[in-house]
Amino acid sequence: MNTDIANQLRVAKKATTDLNLIQSDTRTIILKTLAANLEKHIENIIQENQKDLSLMLEQDPRYDRLLLNKERILSLANDVRKVASLPNPLGVNLLEKSMPNGLSIKKITVPLGVIAVIYESRPNVTIDIFSLCFKSGNVCILKGGKEAHFTNSYLLLLIKNTLKNFNINTDIVCLLPPERALITPLLNATGLVDLCIPRGSQNLINFVRDNAKIPVIETGAGIVHTYFDKSGDLEKGKKIINNAKTRRVSVCNALDTLIIHADRLKDLPELVETLSQKNVIIYADQDAYQVLDKNYPEQLLMKAKPQDFGHEFLDYKLAIKTVPNIKAAIDHIQQFSSYHSEAVIAEDESAIDKFLTEVDAAAVYANASTAFTDGGEFGLGAEIGISTQKVHARGPMGLEALTSYKWVIRGTGQIRD
């Protein structure tokens, strides 16, 4: 392992002891102070962010994710306050029982330990990760991408200065250099890092999963579908589809494929009409193309190719698939889903129940936009990522997902026969 990285991780591991001694009320006060400092230094944050943005083309899909403006920084500070106000997730009694032999057994929540998060062009993640890890008693190792290095470095400075004002060991948070070559040593840090969470492209997630010797929770990649059923309400559908696709195209809960029942193809032009106002390019299968031809801007309408399905666009692009029934819709989703977020628009309760029961995803929706798959929208304050796996955590990962548990047994001298 790289010697410098190993030393940083050892220092971080040692800092878990100091972090565990901080009282819950103190953590809350520190997080509220951090939120105030974010607001106080908005102009400085934007200045550092502009340095990063100047090195990226505005047409790059990552540009929007990298951008921090006043509105987003204020929202970020508000998210920190929400995390601060959440109940303490540690020391929660999950189970308690008295055994016939007199033993008292409790199962209580504890921190995971040292959490490493590898992420790319979203500097807001730096603050989200720290606030959640700090509140849940975990040391955090931050491995941001080079495209956000100036912004991440300044945000880390704000965090460390806030901690210093309370005489807190600043080793509880660490920002590793942005070089990709350092990812492998981090993934090999058995005994020093308790969990790694990759947030970013599918290539990054695949690399981490395939090369890690430490535990990993997969997050991020979202190939998102919305199925407009035979019984779907047209007005609801128009609003939901537009919101899921165009609210923020660069996020993992954005709509990628619209699936439509063949009996409702006549309504397709109206369903997607507002998308043309945002210059959304549609990749339509044969049936959908025939309906949209002359009913959607010619320059924005393309014939779908096989690779357009099962693709996370992260852009103003949408694939459309026509199906004869709900079973075919579910089959298509199960073939191409990344198990992130899937939605149905329907008025038929039996269709809704079938979809919600049979579709395998971290979040399944009926008559609502997939844009809601978010820690803040789920009342978690913020999220460290959206898990697309089933072990330990699934969906938006808030404070509870950053804890484990231990068994506490009290006796009066009992021995086992």
Curated annotation (Swiss-Prot):
Transmembrane regions: none
CDD domains attached to this UniProt entry: ALDH_F18-19_ProA-GPR
Pathway assigned to this chain's UniProt record: Amino-acid biosynthesis; L-proline biosynthesis; L-glutamate 5-semialdehyde from L-glutamate: step 2/2
Record keywords, A-Z: Amino-acid biosynthesis, Cytoplasm, NADP, Oxidoreductase, Proline biosynthesis
GO function terms (MF aspect): glutamate-5-semialdehyde dehydrogenase activity; NADP binding
GO biological process, one term: L-proline biosynthetic process
Keyword NADP among UniProt keywords: yes
Claim: Amino-acid biosynthesis is one of the keywords in the record: yes
Catalytic activity: L-glutamate 5-semialdehyde + phosphate + NADP(+) = L-glutamyl 5-phosphate + NADPH + H(+)
Subcellular location: Cytoplasm
PROSITE patterns in UniProt: PROA
UniProt record similarity statement: Belongs to the gamma-glutamyl phosphate reductase family.
NCBIfam families: PRK00197.1, proA
Function noted in UniProt: Catalyzes the NADPH-dependent reduction of L-glutamate 5-phosphate into L-glutamate 5-semialdehyde and phosphate. The product spontaneously undergoes cyclization to form 1-pyrroline-5-carboxylate.
UniProt name for this protein: Gamma-glutamyl phosphate reductase
Organism for this UniProt entry: Legionella pneumophila (strain Paris)
